Amino acid sequence: MSATLRGANARFGNLLTAMATPLYPDGSIDFAGAQTLAKWLMAGGNDALVINGTTGESPTTSDDEKLDLLDAIIEAIGADKVVAGAGGNDTRHICKLAAASAAKGVAGILSVAPYYNKPCQEGIYRHFRAIADAAAIPVLLYNVPGRTIANIDTATTERIALDQENVIGTKEASGNMMQVADIVSRTPDTFDVYSGDDGTLLPHLAVGGCGIISVISHVATPQMKAVCTKWFAGDAAGAREAFLLTLGITRMIFAQPSPAPTKAALSLLGKPAGPVRLPLVDLNQSQLEALAAFMTERGLI
C-alpha cells in the first residue's frame, strides 16, 4: 500500500468529527462553548468538522440557529475546515438552507437522504441534484437508511456522481459493505466514500473508502486518526490493531441514543456539552456511572 491508495487525498481529509452542539441548561446554544469545543477537536487531529449534523442535533435546531452556529465555528477554526449539514425531506427548504450555508464560505455541504416521505430513487436523485445546484459548492451525500428508511441505491449514487460535478462523495452509514464496495467500484477515484459508522471504519478503508465522519472521535480523536494514518501509510496490521482498540469505545458511545452519551463523555472531560433537546434525553445516573467507569478504565479521563 502507498499514498496512491484511493481516498488518501480526500477533499476534506480522512478524519472529520460530526460535532455535538453544546447547549446551556435551558436548551439554548452555547456558542462560545461550541467555539471552544471546535478548537479542541481540531487541535486533537481532526482534518475538518461537520457542523449541524445529526450529532449536532440538527432535527431540533432552527435554520437561524444553524446559521448562527456556522458563524461562530467559522470564526473559531476557519471556513475551510467546516462542512455544513443541510439535509431534510423538503427539497425547497433544504435548497435554501444549503445556499445560505454555502454563502458563509464553508468548504462543503453534507446532505442526508430525504426521510419519512419515502421517495423513489428518481426522487432522491432529483432531490440531491437540486440541493447541489443551490449550494454550488462541494456536496457529500449522506446515506443512513437506519434513520431515513430510504436507501440511496448504488445506481443512484453512481448516477449523481457522474451527472453532478460538485457532488464529490458520500457518507455511507448503510452498514452494507457490499454496497460500499459497489459504490467504490462504480464511481471515479476522486469520489470520496466516507464511513458514517465508527464500527466500520477499517472495512471501508479496505474496499477503497477515504476515512470517516466520526462520533467517537469526540473522545478518541488520536485513536481514530491512527487507524487512517496507519492504513494510508501502508501499515495494514497497525491499522487493524488500532481499529480493534476503538470498538469498545464505539459500543459505549452508542449504548444510548446519540448524542447523549457523547455529550456526557465530553462533560466528564470538562469540555462544553450540556444537555440534549427533547425528544432525546440525557443519560440517567447509572448510565453515567457506567460511562465514567469505562472511560477511566480505558484511560480516556
Which sequence ranges carry the predicted segments?
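Secondary-structure boundary/capping positions in well-ordered alpha/beta enzyme cores
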Residues: 80-81, 138, 167, 190, ...
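Active-site beta->alpha loop and helix N-cap motifs at the rims of alpha/beta catalytic domains
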Residues: 3-149, 159
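Helix N-cap/beta->alpha junction signal
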Residues: 90, 197-198, 284
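A general structural signal for well-ordered alpha-helical segments in protein cores
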Residues: 34, 66, 70, 94, ...
